[in-house]
From Swiss-Prot:
It is found in: Cell inner membrane. GO terms for cellular component: plasma membrane. Keywords: Cell inner membrane, Cell membrane, Membrane, Symport, Transmembrane, Transmembrane helix, Transport. One of its GO terms (molecular function) is fumarate transmembrane transporter activity. This is C4-dicarboxylate transport protein 3. GO terms for biological process: L-aspartate transmembrane transport. InterPro entries: C4_dicarb_transport, Na-dicarboxylate_symporter, Na-dicarboxylate_symporter_CS, Na:dicarbo_symporter_sf. Responsible for the transport of dicarboxylates such as succinate, fumarate, and malate from the periplasm across the membrane. Belongs to the dicarboxylate/amino acid:cation symporter (DAACS) (TC 2.A.23) family. The keyword Iron-sulfur does not apply. The chain crosses the membrane at residues 22-42, 60-80, 95-115, 162-182, 198-218, 236-256, 321-341, 346-366, 399-419.
């Protein structure tokens, strides 16, 4: 196996870029500057144009998510000659998702019971109108509605509205259809492969705006909510961040070690995506570039195309930790002593409601409303307690979700025997520049 660029030339070790041209450095500086502007000049930071910088960047990313998923999934399936292989990858991915998601939920419950961050909490000023908005959205969420929602009314509508699961369903069916064509499908397979490279080219252009988007999003957040907004609830925030770190470095670290790679080197490899997510609070904003990097890291196109998009709805580890911790915190703050049976109910309910939480900012808060309503409707008003700091917790949710899905893809590829060890080692040892958008492909 040799590693080449799209032009067919060997990939040399990446030359070091000047520090100020490195994307993650630019994003990190932008986040710090945004926080300073939001703190010192909140009136300026909450201007609609500042907010538009962050919102605009997220919209640019979301603009290409549907075509990226379509091209990668269709291409991955269409190039597989064995239909059973697709099903095998899907089953392995779902098994992994459920096992690891359960670990995330259990860790959240254990830490919440040990630390009890909501114990002795004073009465919070309820923002009933804002809570009612989330509760109303959650009220209509039923399992049957979630299943039916996966099926689009029209294919065009699925793409136009950016519904990931709907696009994924159509892409899988379309990929199988091309597979069944055999040699007759060669032309359309080649066209979709070329289209995928073109869309990734769009991503490389859009990513240049990441520092601007991160600056706007962070400035607006600090300017609107202020540093004082988190002081009363710093215990919950700290508990959540520590729990998420424990999950990433211990649970995912052990899983990564079993597969033969270091979680620390992997996180260093995806540092650009982590910082983009930190600035935008949306794990979805890093989906296209994450898929590109995982292919360069040695995961096969078929595994990346199936596992990553599916994981954004079925493998939200950060959201799982958040829901168990936040539910316990609200119950403790309101003086409810949840029984062991009720806490088991949290596990079961959260396992279901989290499946509808996409990588969009704020989706975790809506699923929290759904979980509280099922566990005990009296807990729903307590959402007002965490409403003010949800924005500060959403960064950690999104970061953990991103880490979980990245590791999941590598693990499933390793489990399926579709992981190129040479490319994995080269990528994690930085012999291949992960920021180079000239896609490294594997040739026999």
């Amino acid at each position: 196996m040799t590693t080449t660029t799209m032009a067919g030339t060997p990939v040399a070790p990446a030359a070091a870029k000047p520090w100020y041209k490195v994307l993650y450095v630019q994003v990190l500086i932008a986040i710090v500057l945004g926080a300073i502007v939001g703190w010192l000049w909140p009136t300026v930071a909450t201007n609609d144009w500042i907010k538009a910088l962050g919102d605009g960047f997220i919209k640019l990313i979301k603009m290409v998510i549907a075509p990226i998923i379509f091209c990668t999934v269709v291409s991955g399936i269409a190039h597989i000659q064995d239909a059973k292989k697709v099903g095998r990858i899907g089953v392995k991915a779902l098994v992994y998702f459920e096992v690891v998601s359960t670990f995330a939920l259990v860790i959240g419950l254990i830490i919440g019971n040990l630390v009890r961050p909501g114990a002795g909490f004073g009465n919070a000023a309820a923002n009933e109108a804002a809570v009612a908005t989330y509760a109303k959205q959650a009220a209509g969420q039923k399992s049957v509605d979630f299943v039916l929602h996966i099926i689009p009314d029209t294919v065009v509508g699925a793409f136009a509205q950016g519904e990931i699961l709907q696009v994924l369903l159509f892409s899988v069916l379309f990929g199988f259809a091309i597979m069944s064509l055999g040699e007759r499908g060669h032309t359309i397979r080649s066209f979709i492969d070329d289209a995928a490279h073109a869309v990734f080219g769009v991503i490389s252009i859009v990513m240049r705006a990441a520092p601007i988007g991160a600056f706007g999003a962070m400035a607006y957040t600090i300017g609107k909510f202020g540093t004082g907004a988190i002081l009363n609830l710093i215990g919950l925030i700290a508990t959540f961040y520590v729990t998420a770190a424990l999950f990433v470095f211990v649970v995912l670290g052990i899983i990564a070690r079993l597969a033969g790679f270091s979680i620390f080197k992997f996180l260093a490899y995806i540092k650009d995506e982590l910082l983009i997510v930190l600035g935008t609070s949306s794990s979805e904003s890093a989906l296209p570039s994450l898929m590109e990097k995982l292919e360069r890291l040695g995961c096969s196109k078929s595994v990346v195309g199936l596992v990553v998009p599916t994981g954004y709805s079925f493998n939200l580890d950060g959201t799982n930790i958040y829901m168990t911790l936040a539910t316990l915190f609200i119950a403790q703050a309101l003086g409810f002593d949840l029984s062991f049976g009720q806490q088991l109910t949290i596990l079961v309910v959260a396992m279901l409601t989290s499946k509808g939480a996409s990588g969009i900012t704020g989706a975790g808060f809506i699923t929290l409303a759904a979980t509280l309503a099922v566990v005990d409707p009296r807990l729903v008003p307590g959402m007002a307690i965490v409403l003010g700091i949800d924005k500060f917790m959403s960064e950690c949710r999104a970061l953990t979700n991103l880490c979980g899905n990245g590791v999941a893809c590598v693990i499933v590829a390793w489990w399926e025997g579709e992981l190129d060890r040479d490319k994995l080692n080269a990528g994690l040892s930085r012999q291949i520049d992960p920021t180079d958008m000239e896609t490294a492909i594997t040739t026999d």
